[in-house]
Swiss-Prot record:
It catalyses: S-sulfanyl-L-cysteinyl-[protein] + uridine(34) in tRNA + AH2 + ATP = 2-thiouridine(34) in tRNA + L-cysteinyl-[protein] + A + AMP + diphosphate + H(+). Pfam families: tRNA_Me_trans, tRNA_Me_trans_C, tRNA_Me_trans_M. This is tRNA-specific 2-thiouridylase MnmA. It comes from Sodalis glossinidius (strain morsitans). The record marks H129, Q345 as: Interaction with tRNA. Its EC number is 2.8.1.13. The gene is mnmA. It is an enzyme of class 2 (transferase).
Length: 369
C-alpha cells in the first residue's frame, strides 16, 4: 500500500467511535487523512437535546490525538431542503419514512463528496459505516458489513457504483467490540461513547414533542378491527404499523388481555385501526409493491428474480420473488407471510452478501382472511 501516501482521504467525523477508528485505520494504511465534521441542523439547539457541540468536541479530541486536521462545514440548508422537508411531507400523509436513508443519499454521500472534491481536494471520502465495497468488472458493489449485528447496507442502498468507487469503509471488516477495543487501546475520547439512535443528525429527541412542533396535531379515534372505539390518538403521524407501545389502551370488554397492535391507518376518517395479538391476520402481508427504485451497480430488472429482502433495519432477510411491473415498480412476493410491512419504509434486496438496491414500499398485499 506504499502508494496510498499520495492519496488524500477525508473522513466524515461524527464524534462517534466508528468514524474515529476509521480515521486511524486509514492512517495505518498510509493514506493522507483529514477529518470533516458536518453540522446539519440549526433549529432549537438547546442543551437538553442537542449533542452537536459535544460531538464536535469529541471529533476535535480524536483528531488531536491522531494528529490530523479537522474541517467543519454547515449543510443545514441542504439537510432541511432535501431531507427534512420530505420527512415531514411523508408523515403528513400517513407514511413512515426513513430519514437516515435519505440523509445518506443527499448529505453524507452527495454534499459531503462534492465538498471534499471541490474544497478539500480529496481522492476518497470515508465513513464509519459497517459495509464493504468490492470492485467487480470495473464497477463497485456494496456488500454487507462482516458484523451481522451492525451491518448498515440497508441504509446505503441508494448509492451508485460511481459514488462507491470514491468511498472507503475501513471498519466494514470488523466487529463492533473490536472497534471499541482499538479505540480504547489508542486512548481515543470516543472509546466508550454509546451509539446514537436518534434521527440522522437531529439527535436524541423526544420524537412526539419534536414532530408536534412542525406538524399540526389531529386527534382522532382508535378503533378495533370490528369497529369498536377503544381509545383516542393524538395524531396518526405518531404511530406506525406493528406498533404496540404508546397506545394507552388495555384489554377489551370481552376479557381478552392480549396487547393491541396498530394494523392500519384510515386517513380519510383520521382513525387508527388496531387489533389484538402480534400475529393478527390484518397485520400480516404476503407481499408488497415498491417504487422509486435504485440499483447499486446492476441494470434494472427485466425478469423475475429470486432473492431476499429486508423491510426494516436489523430484521432477518425474507426470501422472496421480485417481479418487475410495466409501470416501473416491483412486485415482491414473500415465501411466508410477514408482519408489519410499512408504506414509506424501504425494501432492500440482497443476493447473499451483495446489496442489489431497493425502493420505497408503496403498498402491501394483505393476507386474505
Amino acid at each position: 500500500m506504499s502508494d496510498n501516501g499520495q492519496k488524500k482521504v477525508i473522513v466524515g467525523m461524527s464524534g462517534g467511535v466508528d468514524s474515529s477508528v476509521s480515521a486511524w485505520l486509514l492512517q495505518q494504511q498510509g493514506y493522507r487523512v483529514e477529518g470533516l465534521f458536518m453540522k446539519n441542523w440549526e433549529e432549537d439547539d438547546n442543551e437538553e437535546y442537542c449533542t452537536a457541540a459535544s460531538d464536535l468536541a469529541d471529533a476535535r479530541a480524536v483528531c488531536d490525538t491522531l494528529g490530523i486536521a479537522l474541517h467543519t462545514v454547515n449543510f443545514a440548508a441542504e439537510y432541511w431542503d432535501n431531507v427534512f422537508a420530505h420527512f415531514l411531507a411523508e408523515y403528513q400523509v400517513g407514511r413512515t419514512p426513513n430519514p437516515d436513508i435519505l440523509c445518506n443519499k443527499e448529505i453524507k454521500f452527495k454534499a459531503f463528496l462534492e465538498f471534499a472534491d471541490d474544497d478539500l481536494g480529496a481522492d476518497y471520502i470515508a465513513t464509519g459505516h459497517y459495509v464493504r465495497r468490492a470492485d467487480v468488472n470495473g464497477k463497485s458493489r456494496l456488500l454487507r458489513g462482516l458484523d451481522d449485528n451492525k451491518d448498515q447496507s440497508y441504509f446505503l442502498y441508494t448509492l451508485g457504483h460511481a459514488q462507491l468507487a470514491r468511498c472507503l469503509f475501513p471498519i466494514g471488516e470488523l466487529a463492533k467490540p473490536e472497534v471499541r477495543r482499538i479505540a480504547a487501546d489508542l486512548g481515543l475520547a470516543t472509546a466508550a461513547k454509546k451509539d446514537s439512535t436518534g434521527i440522522c443528525f437531529i439527535g436524541e429527541r423526544k420524537f412526539r414533542d419534536f414532530l408536534g412542533r412542525y406538524l399540526p396535531v389531529q386527534p382522532g379515534a382508535i378503533v378495533s378491527v370490528d369497529g369498536q372505539e377503544v381509545g383516542r390518538h393524538q395524531g396518526l403521524m405518531y404511530h406506525t404499523l406493528g406498533q404496540r407501545k404508546g397506545l394507552g389502551i388495555g384489554g377489551t370488554r370481552d376479557g381478552s388481555e392480549d396487547p393491541w397492535y396498530v394494523v392500519d391507518k384510515d386517513l380519510d376518517h383520521n382513525r387508527l385501526i388496531v387489533a389484538q395479538g402480534h400475529q393478527h391476520p390484518r397485520l400480516m402481508s404476503t407481499g408488497l409493491t415498491a417504487g422509486q427504485l435504485h440499483w447499486v451497480e446492476r441494470e434494472p430488472l427485466t425478469e423475475a428474480l429470486r432473492c431476499t429482502v429486508k423491510i426494516r433495519y436489523r430484521q432477518p432477510d425474507i426470501a422472496c420473488l421480485v417481479t418487475p411491473q410495466a409501470d416501473g415498480r416491483l412486485q415482491v412476493t414473500f415465501d411466508q407471510p410477514v408482519t408489519a410491512v410499512t408504506p414509506g419504509q424501504s425494501a432492500v434486496f440482497y443476493l447473499a452478501e451483495r446489496c442489489l438496491g431497493g425502493g420505497i414500499i408503496e403498498a402491501r398485499q394483505p393476507l386474505s382472511h
